[in-house]
Amino acid sequence: MFNFKFVHLRVHSDFSMIDGLVKPNILAQHAKKLNMPAIAITDSSNLHGMIKFYRATFSQGIKPIIGVDFKVFPDDKYVSSNMFTKITLLAVNNSGYRNLLLLLSRAYKIGYNNKVGVFITKEWLVEHRKGIILLSGGCYGDIGVNLLNNNKSLVLNCLSFYNRFFENFYYLEIMRIGRSNEEQYISRIKDISAREGIPVVATNEVCFLNKQDFEVHKIRVFINLGCTIKSNSAHYNYTPQQFMRTSNEMEELFLDFPDAISNTIEISKRCNVILKFNKYFLPKFQTGNMNTTDFLVMKAKKGMQKRLIQLFPNKQDRINNVNRYYTRLLSELNVINKMGFPGYFLIVMEFINWAKKNDIPVGPGRGSGAGSLVSYVLNITELDPLSFDLLFERFLNPERVFMPDLDVDFCMDKRDKVIEHVSKIYGEESVSQIISFGTLTAKSVIRDVGRVFGFPYGFLNRLSKLIPLDLGMTLEKAISQKVELLELYKFDKDVRELINIAKRLEGITRNVSKHAGGVVISPKKITDFVPLYYDENGNNPVTQFDKNDIGYTGLVKFDFLGLKTLTVIHGTVKMINTKFSNNQKKLININTISLKDKNCFKFLQTAQTIAVFQLESNGMKDLIRRLKPDSFEDLVALVALFRPGPLQSGMVDNFINRKHGKEKILYPNKECQHALLKPILKSTYGIILYQEQVMKIVQVFANYTLGHADLLRRTMEKKDQVEMNKHREMFKNGAKENNINTKLSTKIFNLLEQFAGYAFNKSHSVSYALVSYQTLWLKLYYPEEFMASAMNADIDNIKKIVVLINECKVMKLKIIPPNVNQSDYYFKVDDDKNIIYGLGAIKGIGKSVILDIVNARKNRKRFSELFDLCVSVNSKRITHKVIEKLIMSGGCDCFGLNRSILMHSCEYIIKSANQYLKSIILKKRDLFGLLLDDFNVIKKKYYSIKKLYSMKQILDWEKDSLGLYLTGHPVDEHVHLQMRYNNVIRLKDLFNNKITTEQISILGMISFLKFKVTKTKKNMVFMILEDSFVQIEVIIFDNILRRYRHLLEKEVIIIVTGRIQKSMFSKKYIVLAEKLI
């Protein structure tokens, strides 16, 4: 039974990222536990948690009160003075709620001060006063501050302001939480209240639930401040009393102020914001004189005609299939129009078609949307759902009214252009991206809490590394999984204290960022529906509600996702088609390539899948080698199988064994066989792999509609036993109607229940398999262009470039080193099929200076020497560091001089070039010749030096600037060791599979060393030996390590003799060392 004595009107959730500790749903649960009839949320300058709070309180049967704590200035003149006060705004009704949205949006747009943060002014308050109750801010409000400063005239001014604009909507706030001057303030407020007739209200400025949370709260605040407990405790301005007191505790605290308690109930009764969550508000799509429904039907039918010609070039084939396609099309259109979503499809159609027309790559599809034929004929997707048995109901279910969700992949580099286009079409004030929130994860909370306690960085780094990277990892799970972490927790008091506090902070909101792809388009101003958050400069608006909450406002989310692979595909096709621009027959359209290319699948079976979408990881390569996919359906299955569920359940082994005839194909197993299952499960060798298969089995067996079947699938995923039992009975009865006995139907239902957790969305699997196939096809037939484009997409990521260059070497592609007379910023392919290294992949040289070099070269075709380069390019950008990096990388080898000479003379050349340029500016023509004569004389001295750097030093420069050895390898200088010692081979011979014995001696350079102690307290070493682009792992056990430890240093050239083993699946060699030289 609710206690109607008191209501908390000032409460911070963890979305007050400075001082909030409690999640909104926990606040609601705790309020219910305390029998509170209502509760407010008043986070600091935001409504981030409002939707979660509103829904949670309603689910608990508690009334939600919506409010915000603001910093406020008297007017704009005071902003620079930092003399702000505090005030709390509570929404009385929906008008007040809308004014909160407008005030918050305005505050983030133009109310930001580096020292204060987000603020509002009193002038804005007046403009947005309708439907708002104000709480004065207590000691920190304008009246409180001026009272305590004995500034009577300002107190009177403030009272006059509130009486004029907020009569009956302004409350003098008092609290007793243990801060200084509270009682002095309260005694004066009592007089003002009596004299002015302004009511008083009691609050507790709640930041945590229980008194014992105070110490943890202190850590939370210091994490936000970025300081330690010892160094900056003065910044902490909170008290142990700021917990959620009970009604009785608040009554006892204010026995001398009974009205201050009863007024909380009065305010709660006045606050009645009603939010409706079951409506959708789509922007208007311009259709001329036609209504939206008819326009969609017209567009779909026109698109269908074009797609049928594309699918069935043969007229008779087209006639044979037209009824099947139009039946499906009309069925989908009927559902879309009945559910009221024609505008949604037209909006998505427009921006996708605009992107395609403007040379912005768009993905072939993503998620369940690929199951829609309407999407296919509108050019939203590039997948024919009928060809792959994809189901529309998996995407849009007429028996479950939810907005459709068409995720769209765009080229990473040009995605923002599509968002800009949408903003122009619908108006900048109607389009926004969506916020996302970072939380204190298991790893980050250890580091953050540890920093507050002052633990050393190295210690915290080691501790956090013990926490696995798995998705959804918690500290509790980490302790149970990692023995080393458990032992530290048990026996190290500091670690135990750190983890115990970290556990209590784990998962709370830490910071804000922008969602990767979410965009909302509103029919009116977005601020009519949600508040906006802007960056510090008042730019880049995002909604204050996250992707999970935005739908409850009625606004529709569109996903504009960036996919780097589309950039790679687009870049590859562009290179190819530019080369063959005069030969139409050789031009390629990546969306029309055959999906039945046998060469493609033979290539796939080699598992040479570096840079192939979704197929790059070692685990995936192992699966490819085992599965040996030989059809597109197998590739679709591959994408679906490579997930923890199938891999851990044994499903993958069954699938592989059935494909290769090592296990009998049953539909699906010995106990549940039935003829109705074979057509559904044939493509997956009798394994239930896809969600669509679950739905079709339910439809065929138990007469479910596909929409109803999707509801069952969702119920199975959620493991909702109450709903499951209802469906179990329905399934049994439906099966009876098809003369299927109860025993068999029960077994099949149980099997479906088991597989529903592992089953994957086939629409998504087909979509991504198509992108995988396209990249595989390009890598097979146009390897140079593909690899160049892949490197261009990652040109800022040197580690990735190194992997891709090594792959080029494996593929025996020719790489032309960086060359200032040949290279551009990006990698490119010349007419002889050589990949020319991109200057943008050289470490430490900015894009602008590289573009200057390339542009200068265009004007003169080539640079004759380094001096010529320096005088031809913007002298401010051609610094000593830039020239050094160009020399070290080999970019200046084209001048025909040893890198040692160039490095020795570069300082003088730069200096001479600058003097020469100055003389030109000063127009001292007589000085030109003298400078050049002097330069040429001195240059000869520099160029004739005999002290050359070693090849090892030059190669080290190369590695330093490029991240890898490109033109040679330090091992090259030690090939004589092969002659000195019998049977010593180089690593590249291993790569070429020239091994005929288990005992081997290999020459290489140590590139990685890791010393470990085994469980039996023995020492061992993991070592990587490398030679050019080949690496091998070497393991050295304790007995060998004791003899050769003195030889183990990074970059040492060494001969390892030992036994070589090759993994059956990964085909990687491992050497167990027996002797080192």
UniProtKB/Swiss-Prot annotation:
Belongs to the DNA polymerase type-C family. DnaE subfamily. DNA polymerase III is a complex, multichain enzyme responsible for most of the replicative synthesis in bacteria. This DNA polymerase also exhibits 3' to 5' exonuclease activity. The alpha chain is the DNA polymerase. It is found in: Cytoplasm. Its EC number is 2.7.7.7. Gene3D superfamilies: 1.10.150.870, Bacterial DNA polymerase III alpha subunit, thumb domain, Metal-dependent hydrolases. SMART domains: POLIIIAc. It is an enzyme of class 2 (transferase). It holds the Pfam family HHH_6. One of its GO terms (molecular function) is nucleic acid binding. Keywords: Cytoplasm, DNA replication, DNA-directed DNA polymerase, Nucleotidyltransferase, Transferase. DNA polymerase III contains a core (composed of alpha, epsilon and theta chains) that associates with a tau subunit. This core dimerizes to form the PolIII' complex. PolIII' associates with the gamma complex (composed of gamma, delta, delta', psi and chi chains) and with the beta chain to form the complete DNA polymerase III complex. This is DNA polymerase III subunit alpha. One of its GO terms (cellular component) is cytoplasm. It catalyses: DNA(n) + a 2'-deoxyribonucleoside 5'-triphosphate = DNA(n+1) + diphosphate. GO terms for biological process: DNA replication.
